């Protein structure tokens, strides 16, 4: 018989409960000897659960994670055309610096690919000066800019870029949760279209372990459980024209990103958007705040959440017919009449009918109405149908 709880919990409750761990920010120490190369260094980097090491040893360790993620899965063919996404975050600048370093090595260690940089402008010209500084530092790369809701043909080089007014469908959605979810799907669709326009076969995204842990929980909460494996995997093949989305920083944590930014003197810049609002303003913001708190107090728990995503198998698509995928997010459709989805639509139908349910004849019509709602938009998955329901008028473009 299991004895857990007999000795581990006293009169005061969980006396042996998990205690907060070390800070996610780590420590940059003063001068000393590196525990790995034994050389004197002006600055030592102390990661959690790792001995203090010099800057060169730390950079070598972090860059190895980047190369190992790509090499272990053999996800990037030789001489591939790569589109690298930069959003101003520390992680995206780390990815840019790592790729630049990998391409400036000798022939044996060089990462053989041709890279271009894309910045998606969501709020005008606020970040252009920072982008120009990046372009000067990483001159070999071509920089492109496009607005979030613009057509792919409006793509411009950084030197020639000027913002224009575009229509924003997000403002027609009632809740911030729906606007953020729709904006994310639109961003992915735009990235795929731009990659196809530039004839790039692969896209690099700068998601790290804590970001992917947040994405995993958010996807499940939003009803995207069927595609959550691809949302957090190294390789996501849902973009159009067989373009592959790669996440080579998936094994890095926030602490390592902050140290890398400090070591390379990178200057992150962020754009003001809805993600910066109150932590309780949307489901995504609430989940992000929850994971951020875990990262500070229980860093290993975030790793557990993230590693759980690695063990989830992606839903296999037995038919390559485009009609079997969602027109918005390109995930495999889930419109089959399952008990769970039927119960959700039944509950919505009850709320809409209100006092009319007192009539006995309406009970049979209620279930019929719920079934009709499930089959009304067969080209959208469950989560994207929820976005459609949040529109004040019209349909998802």
Swiss-Prot record:
UniProt GO cellular component terms: cytosol
Keyword Nucleotide-binding on entry: no
Highest taxon above the source species: Eukaryota
Keywords for this protein: Cytoplasm, tRNA processing
Location in the cell: Cytoplasm
GO molecular function, one term: nucleotidyltransferase activity
GO biological process: protein urmylation; tRNA thio-modification; tRNA wobble position uridine thiolation; tRNA wobble uridine modification
Signal peptide location: none
Pathway(s) per entry: tRNA modification; 5-methoxycarbonylmethyl-2-thiouridine-tRNA biosynthesis
The keyword Acyltransferase is assigned to this record: no
Chief place where the protein resides: cytoplasm
Family: Belongs to the CTU2/NCS2 family.
Protein function: Plays a central role in 2-thiolation of mcm(5)S(2)U at tRNA wobble positions of tRNA(Lys), tRNA(Glu) and tRNA(Gln). May act by forming a heterodimer with NCS6/CTU1 that ligates sulfur from thiocarboxylated URM1 onto the uridine of tRNAs at wobble position.
Name of the protein this chain belongs to: Cytoplasmic tRNA 2-thiolation protein 2
Origin species: Drosophila grimshawi
């Amino acid at each position: 018989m299991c004895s857990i709880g007999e000795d581990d919990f006293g009169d005061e409750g969980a006396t042996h409960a998990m205690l907060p761990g070390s800070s996610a920010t780590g420590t940059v120490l003063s001068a000393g000897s590196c525990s790995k190369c034994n050389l004197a260094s002006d600055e030592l980097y102390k990661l959690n659960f790792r001995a203090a090491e010099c800057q060169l040893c730390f950079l070598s360790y972090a860059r190895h994670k980047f190369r190992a993620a790509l090499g272990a899965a053999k996800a990037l063919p030789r001489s591939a055309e790569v589109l690298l996404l930069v959003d101003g975050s520390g992680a995206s600048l780390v990815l840019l610096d790592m790729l630049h370093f990998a391409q400036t090595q000798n022939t044996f260690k060089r990462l053989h690919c041709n890279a271009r940089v894309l910045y998606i402008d969501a709020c005008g010209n606020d970040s252009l000066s920072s982008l120009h500084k990046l372009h000067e530092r990483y001159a070999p790369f071509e920089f492109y800019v496009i607005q979030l809701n613009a057509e792919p043909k409006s793509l411009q080089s950084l030197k020639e870029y000027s913002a224009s007014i575009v229509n924003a469908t997000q403002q027609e959605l009632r809740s911030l949760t729906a606007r953020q979810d729709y904006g994310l799907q639109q961003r992915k669709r735009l990235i795929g279209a731009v990659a196809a326009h530039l004839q790039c076969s692969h896209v690099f995204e700068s998601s790290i372990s804590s970001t992917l842990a947040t994405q995993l929980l958010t996807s499940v909460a939003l009803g995207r459980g069927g595609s959550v494996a691809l949302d957090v995997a190294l390789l996501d093949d849902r973009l159009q024209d067989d373009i592959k989305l790669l996440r080579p920083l998936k094994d890095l944590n926030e602490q390592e990103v902050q140290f890398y930014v400090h070591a390379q003197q990178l200057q992150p810049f962020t754009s003001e958007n809805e993600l910066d609002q109150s932590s309780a303003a949307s489901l995504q913001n609430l989940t992000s705040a929850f994971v951020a708190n875990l990262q500070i107090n229980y860093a290993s728990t975030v790793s557990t959440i993230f590693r759980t995503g690695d063990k989830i198998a992606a839903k296999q698509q037995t038919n390559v017919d485009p009609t079997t995928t969602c027109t918005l997010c390109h995930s495999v459709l889930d419109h089959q009449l399952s008990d769970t989805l039927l119960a959700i639509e039944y509950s919505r139908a009850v709320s809409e009918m209100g006092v009319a349910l007192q009539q006995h004849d309406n009970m049979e019509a209620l279930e019929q109405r719920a079934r009709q709602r499930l089959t009304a938009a067969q080209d959208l998955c469950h989560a994207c149908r929820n976005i459609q329901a949040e529109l004040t008028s019209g349909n998802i473009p």
